[in-house]
């Protein structure tokens, strides 16, 4: 990413995080945390990665709520950003945390089995 797209991504992250902390009038959006924002080089698209507390249905509902709030969020970004065209917003659930938790669980399981094997051989 260029310096310009990095700065724009940071501003989008801060602005939308602030809006979400105040709350949107959509009951589908649960407790959502933005994890990253990537803006393409031509500044036309911003991919916004988020996590949400709850099961798969809660995550899907939050994603649907965020997608339906795109227009409002772009208008709010327009009040803050000093660029001519506000990027299209694309919300994506960030699965990296779940992936990390799964790896951590597997490593703990391996360590437990290793400790059990050591105690049996002693």
Swiss-Prot record:
It comes from the Bacteria. Keywords: Cytoplasm, Ribosome biogenesis. Belongs to the RbfA family. PROSITE patterns: RBFA. One of several proteins that assist in the late maturation steps of the functional core of the 30S ribosomal subunit. Associates with free 30S ribosomal subunits (but not with 30S subunits that are part of 70S ribosomes or polysomes). Required for efficient processing of 16S rRNA. May interact with the 5'-terminal helix region of 16S rRNA. It comes from Pelobacter propionicus (strain DSM 2379 / NBRC 103807 / OttBd1). One of its GO terms (cellular component) is cytosol. This is Ribosome-binding factor A. Monomer. Binds 30S ribosomal subunits, but not 50S ribosomal subunits or 70S ribosomes. GO terms for biological process: maturation of SSU-rRNA. It is found in: Cytoplasm. Its main location: cytoplasm. GO terms for molecular function: ribosomal small subunit binding. InterPro entries: KH_dom-like_a/b, RbfA, RbfA_dom_sf, Ribosome-bd_factorA_CS. Pfam families: RBFA.
């Amino acid at each position: 990413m260029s310096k310009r797209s990095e700065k724009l991504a940071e501003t989008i992250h801060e602005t939308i995080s602030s809006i979400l902390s105040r709350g949107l009038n959509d009951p589908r959006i649960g407790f959502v945390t933005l994890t990253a924002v990537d803006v393409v080089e031509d500044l036309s698209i911003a991919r916004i990665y988020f996590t949400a507390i709850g099961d798969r249905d809660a995550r899907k509902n939050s994603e649907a709520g965020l997608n339906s709030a795109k227009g409002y969020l772009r208008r709010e970004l327009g009040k803050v950003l000093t660029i001519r065209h506000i990027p299209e917003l694309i919300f994506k659930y960030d699965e990296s945390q779940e992936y990390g938790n799964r790896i951590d669980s597997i490593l703990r399981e391996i360590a437990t089995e290793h400790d059990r094997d050591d105690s049996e051989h002693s």
